[in-house]
């Protein structure tokens, strides 16, 4: 298989069962064959963590303490071989086949080459549980968010239940099969994303720092930067087998969507 010029950076913490399920999905749908640079950063690493990574012949960064997401992202980025980074966490299961995955990642590279800043890859139809933005279904333009200090900073996430390019064409448009907008309407998220290493290190981390409160620190600043964001049908479903083991996650999220109608 053709290799993509992408470093796949996976952050994991204290959840071997979920990581094992996630890596099985990456192997099943060929993601592990699409890059020659795949590394897992383990926080509070255990012997089981290390053995699991060795089973898949993955490079590892082993930490005995929990250093927080900001510092962990920085270490992963600094150690990435390629300028393009696909950032994942241990609970993002790949649900699309090999051809779709490869094609969607190639399109993502095209967006980065067209000067887009972030390409997001959470599955549109099967996002997994929880989907926090669902609380804004029906009032997408009518809520104020304290973190971001503005209205509707999560508007792009409405793509999970409607077509935002049709509903909000002055704010979100389509480019091919991808929705495109700016960071004013697409909050920063640690959900799966493709980004340039230089953008992550020089712009994001230089502002947000290495704090455990990374997402909150960046929120208000992010909405004012006019960064270019793209998101298509997506590839990954949130599936944390430790936190949410009892229910089928897709069934649970669909049920919640129906309850909001």
Description of each model-found segment:
Residues 85:
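Short aromatic/hydrophobic "clamp" motif used to bind/position activated sugar donors
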Residues 117-137:
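Short beta-strand-to-loop element that shapes/binds the nucleotide-sugar donor at the catalytic cleft/hinge
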Residues 4-7, 37:
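Cell-envelope/extracellular polymer assembly enzymes that use nucleotide-activated donors
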Residues 26-61:
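Acidic donor-binding segment of Leloir-type glycosyltransferases
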Residues 15-30:
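Short, well-formed alpha-helical segments that are part of the catalytic scaffolds
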Residues 162, 167-261:
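C-terminal catalytic/acceptor-binding lobe
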Residues 96-121:
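Conserved donor-nucleotide/metal-binding helix-loop-beta segment in metal-dependent transferases, i.e.
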Residues 66-80:
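Glycine-rich, basic loop-to-helix element that forms the pyrophosphate-binding segment
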């Amino acid at each position: 298989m053709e290799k993509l010029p992408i470093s796949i950076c996976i952050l994991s913490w204290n959840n071997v069962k979920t990581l094992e399920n996630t890596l099985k999905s990456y192997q099943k749908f060929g993601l592990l064959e699409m890059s020659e640079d795949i590394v897992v950063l383990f926080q509070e690493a255990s012997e089981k963590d290390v053995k699991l990574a060795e089973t898949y012949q993955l490079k590892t960064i082993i930490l005995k303490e929990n250093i927080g997401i900001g510092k962990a992202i920085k270490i992963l980025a600094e150690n990435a071989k390629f300028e393009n980074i696909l950032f994942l966490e241990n609970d993002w299961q790949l649900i699309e086949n090999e051809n779709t995955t490869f094609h969607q990642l190639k399109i993502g590279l095209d967006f980065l080459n067209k000067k887009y800043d972030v390409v997001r890859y959470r599955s549109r139809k099967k996002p997994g549980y929880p989907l926090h933005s669902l609380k804004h279904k029906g009032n997408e333009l009518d809520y104020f968010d304290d973190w971001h200090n503005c209205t509707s900073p999560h508007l792009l996430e409405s793509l999970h239940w409607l077509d935002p390019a049709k509903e909000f064409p002055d704010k979100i448009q389509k480019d091919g099969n991808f929705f495109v907008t700016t960071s004013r309407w697409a909050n920063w998220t640690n959900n799966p994303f493709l980004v340039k290493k230089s953008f992550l290190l020089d712009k994001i981390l230089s502002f947000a720092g290495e704090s455990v409160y990374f997402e909150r620190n960046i929120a208000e600043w992010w909405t004012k930067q006019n960064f270019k964001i793209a998101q298509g049908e997506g590839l990954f479903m949130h599936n944390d087998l430790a936190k949410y083991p009892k229910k089928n996650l897709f069934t649970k999220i669909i049920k919640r969507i129906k309850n909001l109608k």
